[in-house]
């Protein structure tokens, strides 16, 4: 008997929809009892949908690039051009004319990929899990990658590595390390204090990026699940439709905030070193 043939209480229904499809990396078998605390368990549903949406993004933009025309553009091409111009203008506003050539395409990738991940939150709660259960007998499935802290933290760590890379490349390893020891207080006696402050400042960037995105999307997903689990089907639309309309703003806004903060952090890493640093 599948989970959708069972009579679940509201608590069981909500708990069920908050569980990921996991695989045990020690045995490479699907985990029967969901356990988010185990280091060796991998949320393969989050990985699958994030890669799947990434592939859709690449294929779609590759298709549009091949159909690109210099004359009067179609609606899709015009929309893409507006999006690209919007992102380029944001990058130029922050970087000025000294923009690194990797920043605009990186920003576009982050925005569109996160938008697609967040957009999955608008799909009805039971739609994809029911199909997966019917075809593959999968009992647990979550389809919103950005509601998984592992995905948001992974993306933030990628940005963090770029911050370190550009910082070291721009300033040199010696000056980069000196800034840890001699900022904000240019004094040998205050090196321990500087080190603690700089480490907190540096590590707070990926942590804040990941938790902000995760918290907003997870809470949105949870509200959809609560509406679906606590109300009868004929009453769900009264709350779910207005919330979905409002949630569209959150979906776009969170992708935009992640992109803008990434641009700002990378611009900070490319700033010229402080001349007062010892």
Swiss-Prot record:
What membrane topology is given?
Multi-pass membrane protein
Q: Which UniProt keywords apply?
A: ATP synthesis, Cell membrane, CF(0), Hydrogen ion transport, Ion transport, Membrane, Transmembrane, Transmembrane helix, Transport
Could you name the domain of life of the organism this protein comes from?
Answer: Bacteria
Instruction: Note the SUPFAM superfamilies from the entry.
Output: F1F0 ATP synthase subunit A (SSF81336)
Which BP terms does GO give this entry? proton motive force-driven plasma membrane ATP synthesis
Q: What is its main location?
A: membrane
Tell me, what's a Pfam family for it?
Answer: ATP-synt_A
One GO cellular-component annotation of the UniProt record comes to: plasma membrane
A single GO molecular function, which one? Answer: proton-transporting ATP synthase activity, rotational mechanism
Similarity annotation: Belongs to the ATPase A chain family.
Subunit structure of this entry?
F-type ATPases have 2 components, CF(1) - the catalytic core - and CF(0) - the membrane proton channel. CF(1) has five subunits: alpha(3), beta(3), gamma(1), delta(1), epsilon(1). CF(0) has three main subunits: a(1), b(2) and c(9-12). The alpha and beta chains form an alternating ring which encloses part of the gamma chain. CF(1) is attached to CF(0) by a central stalk formed by the gamma and epsilon chains, while a peripheral stalk is formed by the delta and b chains.
Tell me the protein's name: ATP synthase subunit a
């Amino acid at each position: 008997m599948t989970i959708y043939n069972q009579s679940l209480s509201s608590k069981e229904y909500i708990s069920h929809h908050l569980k990921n499809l996991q695989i045990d990396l020690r045995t490479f078998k699907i985990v029967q009892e969901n356990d988010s605390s185990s280091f060796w368990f991998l949320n393969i549903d989050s990985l699958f949908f994030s890669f799947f949406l990434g592939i859709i993004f690449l294929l779609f933009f590759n298709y549009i690039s091949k159909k690109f025309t210099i004359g009067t553009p179609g609606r899709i091409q015009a929309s893409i051009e507006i999006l690209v111009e919007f992102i380029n203008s944001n990058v130029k506003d922050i970087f000025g004319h000294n923009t690194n050539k990797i920043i605009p395409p990186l920003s576009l990738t982050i925005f569109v990929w996160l938008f697609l991940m967040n957009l999955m939150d608008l799909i009805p709660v039971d739609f994809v899990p029911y199909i997966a259960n019917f075809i593959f007998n999968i009992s647990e499935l979550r389809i919103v990658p950005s509601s998984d802290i592992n995905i948001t933290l992974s993306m933030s760590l990628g940005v963090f590595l770029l911050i370190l890379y550009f910082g070291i490349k721009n300033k040199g390893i010696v000056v980069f390390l000196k800034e840890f020891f001699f900022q904000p207080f240019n004094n040998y006696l205050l090196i321990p204090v500087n080190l603690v402050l700089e480490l907190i400042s540096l590590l707070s960037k990926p942590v804040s990026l990941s938790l902000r995105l995760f918290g907003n999307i997870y809470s949105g997903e949870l509200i959809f699940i609560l509406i679906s689990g606590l109300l009868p089907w004929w009453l769900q639309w009264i709350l779910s439709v207005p919330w979905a309309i409002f949630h569209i703003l959150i979906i776009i806004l969170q992708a935009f905030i992640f992109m803008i903060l990434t641009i700002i952090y990378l611009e900070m890493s490319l700033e010229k070193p402080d001349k007062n640093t010892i």
